[in-house]
Amino acid sequence: MDLGALLDELESGDQELVQKSLAEYNQENSQCFFFNAEQREERKKLGELVISFLNRDLQPSCQIACLETIRILSRDKYALSPFTGRSAIQTLAQYAGLDYSEEMEMPCIPDGESAVEALKGLCNIIYNSVEAQEVAKDLRLVCGLARRLKLYNETRSSHESKFFDLRLLFLLTALSVDMRRQLAQELRGVSLLTDALESTLALKWSDIYEVVTDHLAPPLGKEETERVMEILKALFNITFDISRREVDEEEAALYRHLAAILRHCLLRQSDGEDRTEEFHGHTVNLLVNLPLMCLDVLLTPKVEQGSVEYMGMNMDTVEVLLQFLHRRLDRGHKLREMLTPVLNLLTESSRVHRETRKFLRAKVLPPLRDVKNRPEVGNTLRNKLVRLMTHVDTDVKHCAAEFLFVLCKENVSRFVKYTGYGNAAGLLAARGLLAGGRGEGCYSEDDDTDTEEYREAKANINPVTGRVEEKQPNPMDGMTEEQKEYEAMKLVNMFDKLSREQIIQPMGVTSDGRLGPLDEAAQKMLQRQESSDLDSDSD
């Protein structure tokens, strides 16, 4: 469809002709997501005419054609100016049924194709334009969406209508701090979205914080999964700072209720492995945000036939999280995005729940038998996590090390035993534990159990590599004392030269257990020695 001819027809104002021409243009460009720069001004002009045309009294078919055109044009972030002004956003909000006023007693519940197309256009525009985000805030679109969400269970709206309501809510709260705060505080968004989540999943409760989970139920349908994931994403946006502040009893009850629903989500499958993985990924992301004190509900359900039991506790959820970690480790891409949430969740849960820590330790760090290979060599979960401890991404490296350190109850010697000093050095240096000892966590005093294989090989294990090394011949065998002294001085001079030319900087462990320049470390040791000598003299 020639853009020039289309513009002429729009300017003519003939509704039937406009509808026919726009329908043809929409069909030709339905799969167009990249636009050439040459016709940008013509597309802007088309956008202005279409948004203006929508303010007329139009037949439904013409409304739909205009809104479809806006959806297509709004994919081009360089030609959005016709749609980002207050008037244009307000027009689209009216078609979507989101125009908000305090006097409005009931929200508009549109369910036609026009409303869905308007929502799609708004999603594109809000996503691509900061100006549009500000207008959406001024027009209180979040309030309109929240009002509609309150009737989520009572309306028979189509899947598309509900889905794009939720998608728009996610985008508004992701892109605007003010709208995020408004939904969370003024509109009680956590409660609102939790109710929508519960409704979509059609939950039944056996106890206050225990959902009835039918393990023989069919997988969650595609449409329900899509809506659930949008709800989880919106909840993530408005809860990301909760774990950093104190919550009162009412809030704690709300978050425990939500955690119980998220437990159910982890135990449900969706239609296909990839969709289930995505569904569980959003669930894990949200669980990380919740206060740790509220995650006890993950372990409270009664042990039933087929449940994973440990120390009398139901470990179904922890087992699912462990399998989820396995799969993400094997994928090996986008490690920060894929791994850090689940590693953080397992780490913090292990800190506060003894049963979780002991169960995970039995799975991840079973009694050590393989002392011939380096800790990072192999395909066990321990091997894969130890490999991550020297990853180039600092966040990934830290999360993997912290998880294993907590499973070792923050005991340095135990941590080194399972990972090797070379792999452990980064975390120990950051924690000031290079000289040994243990971290600040409070743990029970049960002992580590050494296998017979480990006890027999312990004396020959190289603590740096974490394995038994073959004995190497002593390079000084056969040397006279003069030759040894000569080689030693030669080595000292080489290090001295490298140090003076600032090619290397010799480091040592300081009194606070961290790495520091060797001269500083030596100076502090000398000062301590002098202080000790003075104390001895005074006696």
Swiss-Prot record:
Disordered, as annotated region: 506-539
Record-stated family: Belongs to the synembryn family.
One Pfam family matching this protein: Ric8
Name under which the protein is recorded: Chaperone Ric-8A
InterPro entries: ARM-like, ARM-type_fold, Chaperone_Ric-8_A/B, Gua_nucleotide_exch_fac_Ric8
Keywords for the protein's UniProt record, in alphabetical order: Chaperone, Cytoplasm, Guanine-nucleotide releasing factor
Keyword Ligase in annotation: no
One biological process term in Gene Ontology: G protein-coupled receptor signaling pathway
Species annotation: Xenopus laevis (African clawed frog)
